[in-house]
Amino acid sequence: MENGEYAFILKKGYDSREVINTYRDQIESKTGEWLESIQDLDDDLLIEKAAYEYIMENAEYDFDTFNTMFQYTNGVPVEEVNPYNENCQNIVGFFMDGKVVCGGYARTMQYLCNVAGLDSLYIESGRREHAWNMVKLYDDWYCIDVTWMDTGGDATPESKIVNKSYETFRSNDDTSTNDPMSGMFRYHALGGLIQKMGPKCVKDTVEKP
């Protein structure tokens, strides 16, 4: 970003300039509409809420791509795997067709928070099974999982996946289950680098100054 202008870098090795321009135009247009809709909000918590509600209203979990990913990682031959949505893990997937998996949810949340003036980080679990966010509200950082909020239908302030400490996030996980969906959605083990150098999320209640 320079002088208030954002540059979109789309890592799409085989797309034409026309296709990339289409992505850019759509993202800029939708972003502008959303920013206009929240221009009267001046509170961190309300801006964050507007971001995740916008995502939940316009995103759909891409179960077809999830199944493809799960089959591939379990040794199913590539030719037997379903078609794969290559944009499911980024903001292009959200803004173009609304179909994403956890990476797309988290990248979009990070993007919307950032363009609206909130600090936000994209977080991957230690073995990259899942992605979520940390968002800075006022002077403290909190964990939030928009994927599980959308697919689990729980976006209330009382939820254990909305603006909670990292320890609360970890306490939600049940790694004893054999259900692959539970593991992919809810595995919140931090990678070593972010655990050592990242912001600390230690509060379970947002405290306004």
Provide a role label for each language-model segment.
Residues Y14-G93:
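Secondary-structure boundary elements
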Residues E18, T22, D97-V100, E124:
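Alpha-helix capping and helix-loop boundary segments enriched in small/acidic/polar residues
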Residues I91-Y105:
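A short, highly charged nucleic-acid-interacting micro-segment common to nuclease
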Residues G103-R170:
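Hydrophobic/aromatic-rich core segments of domains that either
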Residues A155-P209:
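Low-complexity, Gly/Ser/Thr/Pro-rich intrinsically disordered linker/tail segments
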